């Protein structure tokens, strides 16, 4: 394993940057829920997150340049940027999954903010644990790949047949969900922003808790693909953790941008569903067909771009005529 550049000074600096960006993110995300310009605010938030990551990378470059040499500073500067951009690109399917889960369980925008608030911190904990202890710890949970992919494939097909993700798919009354609600004492009723509530004197979990667990499982499962990809760039835990953390925090804003775009456009709803079906098939065939991570990310980006182009140049022209 390579020697790490993570000195106490850099780790402390990272902690300060992390606290600052979390405060900024939480403040902005609290505003967007109650504003009509959610899309624009999310764009600002995404830009701030990216600029903060770049500023931190510049700090790394300056520190290494004056404590070691310019060559090592340049190498680590480019490595951090590469890891950050790679994590962002590989998280597209993760963000799409968030939207799909929120739609399936009819989670309001206010409740989405609560779930993503706690989900972000849990994702940071899980991600750092995976990096430190290795992906092999998740090998005994490999069955989750297939459970999640079957659910994705099933709900994706139903969504297409029911005319897009904008139409609510009644997952609450399916056999699988009814069994989960009964087995794990989960109520179908929301209780403000609470993850747990009391019914008939018994403490039960709310749908918010169920969706939070599903989102965290989703993040753990997809991180098995993304983290090894970052290890191909560098094995320095400091670079891996810092670039991953900055990327994860910025995903909330990316989700808001995606969610608002889907609400405004018609075709992209089918594009997201197609992406989720592709992800499920990719997971199911993982043992037989090895689809490269970058190829998968390229496919997802192409689908989204194609949907926007079709929406802009076909449906808008058609509506004018």
Curated annotation (Swiss-Prot):
<keyword id="KW-1133">Transmembrane helix</keyword>
<keyword id="KW-0812">Transmembrane</keyword>
<feature type="transmembrane region" description="Helical">
    <location>
        <begin position="293"/>
        <end position="315"/>
    </location>
</feature>
<dbReference type="InterPro" id="IPR005496">
    <property type="entry name" value="Integral_membrane_TerC"/>
</dbReference>
<feature type="transmembrane region" description="Helical">
    <location>
        <begin position="10"/>
        <end position="28"/>
    </location>
</feature>
<feature type="transmembrane region" description="Helical">
    <location>
        <begin position="116"/>
        <end position="138"/>
    </location>
</feature>
<feature type="transmembrane region" description="Helical">
    <location>
        <begin position="94"/>
        <end position="111"/>
    </location>
</feature>
<keyword id="KW-1003">Cell membrane</keyword>
<dbReference type="Pfam" id="PF03741">
    <property type="entry name" value="TerC"/>
</dbReference>
<feature type="transmembrane region" description="Helical">
    <location>
        <begin position="266"/>
        <end position="283"/>
    </location>
</feature>
<feature type="transmembrane region" description="Helical">
    <location>
        <begin position="237"/>
        <end position="259"/>
    </location>
</feature>
<feature type="transmembrane region" description="Helical">
    <location>
        <begin position="200"/>
        <end position="222"/>
    </location>
</feature>
<protein>
    <recommendedName>
        <fullName>Uncharacterized membrane protein bbp_156</fullName>
    </recommendedName>
</protein>
<keyword id="KW-0472">Membrane</keyword>
<comment type="similarity">
    <text>Belongs to the TerC family.</text>
</comment>
<feature type="transmembrane region" description="Helical">
    <location>
        <begin position="41"/>
        <end position="63"/>
    </location>
</feature>
<feature type="transmembrane region" description="Helical">
    <location>
        <begin position="143"/>
        <end position="165"/>
    </location>
</feature>
<dbReference type="GO" id="GO:0005886">
    <property type="term" value="C:plasma membrane"/>
</dbReference>
